[in-house]
Regions:
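Short catalytic/metal-binding and nucleic-acid-binding patches
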Residues: 14-18, 50, 80
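An active-site-proximal "capping" alpha-helix that borders the catalytic cofactor pocket
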Residues: 40-44, 78-94
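Divalent metal-dependent phosphate-bond-processing catalytic cores, especially two-metal-ion Mg2+/Mn2+ enzymes
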Residues: 25-54, 67, 114-203
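Inter-helical turn/loop segments and adjacent helix faces that build the functional surface
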Residues: 51, 90-100
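Conserved N-terminal diphosphate/IPP-binding helix and adjacent helical/loop segment
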Residues: 1-29, 33-37, 41
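His-Asp-centered metal-binding catalytic motifs of divalent-metal-dependent phosphohydrolases/nucleases
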Residues: 40, 58-74, 83, 105-113
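Conserved aromatic-histidine-acidic binding/catalytic patches
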Residues: 28, 32, 71, 75, ...
Length: 203
């Protein structure tokens, strides 16, 4: 896996996209920042390793992770289709990826758009579960509160208004991959309990 990680870190599509985001993204994207993209990339690879995915799948996941928020370069609402098209264009131009692989990466990125009713996320490709879990991994990690504050700052709302929205999201959210369930479920439950306690203070 170490050789694969080195290979992916040297993948031009990943490097160029991450560097472009770092130099170009709106600095008021406090949550959807270049650091978030790097975090999702790292987390995606860790989840893929945990579930022993093959090297080609890990590469496709890494490309999807690098591009999953690239649409923010053009607009904030409904940015996912833009990022998906950026990924497809870059993969096509490289000449190293089949049409099926391009379609797979496109669908993974489209799947990162949160669903407004019912389940918060829906996987429509065989690799989407690992990207989706990486994208919302903070729900089941120690940095849950820090990331929640960053999102509130980005949305320009008070944390008191952010917390009920976060609770609603967590109630509709389920981990999609086996690794996501193993690594994040317990901490997400603990974070949810702490969130409920915080909300109860305001009542």
């Amino acid at each position: 896996m170490e050789n694969l990680k080195t290979e992916i870190k040297a993948e031009p599509l990943v490097i160029e996209t991450v560097e472009h985001l770092a130099s170009t993204l709106d600095p008021t994207l406090y949550y959807h920042s270049p650091d978030h993209t790097k975090d999702v990339l790292r987390q995606t690879m860790e989840l893929a390793e945990e579930d022993a995915l093959d090297s080609r799948d890990v590469l496709l996941l890494a490309i999807a992770a690098a591009f999953h928020d690239a649409g923010f370069l053009e607009q904030r609402p409904k940015n996912e289709p833009i990022g998906a098209q950026m990924a497809v264009q870059a993969m096509s131009a490289s000449g190293r990826f089949s049409q099926a692989e391009q379609d797979l990466v496109e669908q993974m990125i489209l799947d990162t758009q949160l669903v407004m009713e019912g389940p918060a996320q829906i996987s429509n490709s065989r690799l989407s579960p690992w990207l989706l879990d990486a994208d919302l991994a903070n729900l089941g990690r120690d940095d849950f509160w820090d990331q929640t504050r960053l999102l509130a700052k980005e949305l320009e709302i008070e944390i008191a208004s952010m917390l009920p929205m976060t609770r609603a999201l967590m109630q509709r959210h389920d981990w999609q991959s086996p690794a996501g369930k193993r690594l994040f479920a317990a901490k997400k439950e603990a974070n949810f309990v702490a969130l409920e306690e915080e909300l109860s203070k305001d009542n």
